[in-house]
Amino acid sequence: MRAEARAAVGELLEAAGLSPGQVLVVGCSTSEVIGRRIGTAGSEAVAGAILEPLLEATQAAGVHLAVQCCEHLNRALVVERAAAERYDWERVTVVPVPRAGGALAARAMRRLPDAVVVEEIKADAGLDIGLTLIGMHLRRVAVPVRLKTAAIGHARVVAARTRPKLIGGARAVYEMQ
């Protein structure tokens, strides 16, 4: 799973073309990764195996990592305090734990430097491991990215990048001539 996570995040970062300072949101059901139904068998060991490659890749790219909590915490996100302050994200008071927040968010809370929890963000790209519904935290307009890495363990992987809206209708011009 570590190699699959490394491959998936690498493919997405390349396809999305994120610049330093942009944000990648990740949602992950470790239950789904081990072949169980979401929310039933979270694994801190699996969370660690997935989080480390995510951190390595995002830190190397200068991209902020946001880890989505589960439904019990309203899909709040674990981020570094510096990112929360830079983007003026509203902080909330909670400590994610495996049974309320999810194993990956709980691990991220302990592992990210100066971690805090925020209620919502608008990320530039997203990686959804196990169909955790990260779309609420993506900028508009989300564009699907089909990865070669279609699964991590047993969990399906869905990815997206974002682009600015195209506005103006039939007479609009979208590229500088």
Swiss-Prot record:
Disulphide bridges, residue numbers: none
Family stated for the protein in its record: Belongs to the UPF0340 family.
InterPro entries noted in UniProt: Antibiotic_NAT-like, DUF436
Record Gene3D superfamilies: Hypothetical protein TT1679
Pfam families, alphabetized: DUF436
Organism of derivation: Symbiobacterium thermophilum (strain DSM 24528 / JCM 14929 / IAM 14863 / T)
Protein name: UPF0340 protein STH78
Membrane spanning stretches: none
